[in-house]
Amino acid sequence: MKIISHLGPKNTYTGQATRMLAERIEEETELVDLASLEAVARSVALHEADMGVMAYYNYLEGLVQECLDLIYENDLKITGMQRLPIVLSLGAHSENHSTAEVYSHPKALAQCSGWLWDHYRDSKQIPTTSTAAAAQRVAEAKSGLAIASSEALKKYGLDLVGEDIGNKRYGRTNFTDFYLVARENGCAFDKTREYLTMVAITPHVDRPGLLAEILQQTAYHNLNNVKIHSRPALDDVAIEGLEPQMFYLEVVGHRNNDDMRRCIDSLRYKMKPEGRDIEVVRVLGSYERP
C-alpha cells in the first residue's frame, strides 16, 4: 500500500487533486491529510509517506514559492501533476450571516479580492490553513463567512451566500496545478507523450548576461521554457558583494530526452566555478504535461 500525504483537511482542492492522482497509481493507496505543506514534504523525506501532493501554481496568483523550496530543500522528486479548475463560493451559518469576518486560505482570499471589495470591503479577512478549515471554523463558531468550494461549504452545513466569486482574467477559468512528489524519480519516458521538467539552477559565478546565457542554452538545445522563477539562493553561495540568486526553470521535455540531457550538462559546465565540484543544476523531476 502506498501512503500519500497532502494538505488537509480532506475537503479541499488539494484533497480532490490527491484523489485524482491516486487513481493513476497501480497499487492500493491510503490518503493522509496533514497541517501544512512543510509537514507534507517532511513526511515524504522522512519515509512516513511514500508520496505527497502540494499546490505549485495558480493561474491568478502565480507561483506557490514554498512548494518549490520544500521540494528542493528536502531533495524530493516531482513525478506527476494534476490541474484543477478552481471555483470558489462564499458560505455562512444558517443561524448567523454575520459579515464582520471572512475566513479562507490566503491564496483564496487573494483570488476573490475583487468580489470581496465590491460586496464586503469592510469585513476583516482572516487567513486559515485551508479553504475547508475556513468552512469548518464558520460552521463550528456559527459566525463569519467562509470562502471554499461549494462542496466543502455544503458538507459543513453552510448556506451559499455567493457562488463563483473568484477574480476573472481574460475570461479564463482559474486553475491550480498540483505536484505529486516522491523520494525517487518515477515518471518513465514515453516518446508518444509530452512532458515538463523542473530544473533548479544555482550559479556559483556571476557575470553580465548570466540569465540570458541560461535561456540561450535551452534555446540552443531546442527546448522551450514554460516558466522561470528567481529567488535568493537556498544554498551557501560565496559571491562577494552580491545577493546570490537561484532560478527555477520549467522546461518542455523529459529529463531522459537527449536534448534535455545535453542542455543540463552544458549548464552544469557553465554555471560552476573552475576547479570546484559543486552542484549547480538539479533536476527536480519530470511529469506529464496537463
Q: Where are the model-predicted features located?
A:
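Domain-level signature for soluble enzymes in the chorismate/prephenate branch of the shikimate pathway
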Residues: 1-290
